[in-house]
Amino acid sequence: METDETIKKGFLRLERYAQNIPGGFHCCAEDPENGYPFAYVSDRFLEILGWERAEFAARFDNRYTALVHPDDLAAGLRYRNAENSATYAKNGDSIFRLLGKNGYRWVSSAANRVEWHGDGYIVGTITDIT
């Protein structure tokens, strides 16, 4: 089992990779009952939406579903389960709104489900298309 320090080092390494992505990067636990909690959010993800890390965590209670516009939940969640993941990967991006500090931003998102140590996660990118 990995320690918190090992996980932290892994996320720091991930941040170095995420800095090379033109959009924002996020990773969520595959836990729909708890709103798909964020395991990781890149600095660029926060920058696109205008949030500081501390206010983002407080505002959304670390839940992906709290960030998605209520009318867009179907689009924002369509790839977030094992049954849809393979189909989603073949069909391309999803377009929906995420709540930014100054209002909703339209984003294009590409994501896939991965397993890590037996747990399911959704990893994805967002690009601002507002």
Regions found by a protein language model. Give the residues of each.
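Short, charged amphipathic alpha-helical "coupling" segments at sensory-output junctions
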Residues: 1-13
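PAS-family sensory domain signal
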Residues: 10-62
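Short coil/loop residues immediately preceding or within conserved phosphate-binding loops
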Residues: 36, 91-93, 104, 121
